[in-house]
């Protein structure tokens, strides 16, 4: 079952990206290195509630 998730920057806490994840394959919160336009650098983004 795929669900929509929002990714937030760990530095500035801005919610920058929306994506889909498969809950069966990824039961935990996902983390990705993505570009944050507010920090103007690549930072770690975590799944939010």
Swiss-Prot record:
Keyword Ribonucleoprotein: yes
Organism: Clostridium perfringens (strain 13 / Type A)
HAMAP family hit by this protein: Ribosomal_bL33 (MF_00294)
GO annotation terms (biological process): translation
Name of the protein described by the UniProt record: Large ribosomal subunit protein bL33
Family statement: Belongs to the bacterial ribosomal protein bL33 family.
InterPro entries xrefs: Ribosomal_bL33, Ribosomal_bL33_CS, Ribosomal_bL33_sf, Ribosomal_zn-bd
GO CC annotation terms, alphabetical: cytoplasm; ribonucleoprotein complex; ribosome
Keywords: Ribonucleoprotein, Ribosomal protein
Gene name in the database record: rpmG
GO terms for MF: structural constituent of ribosome
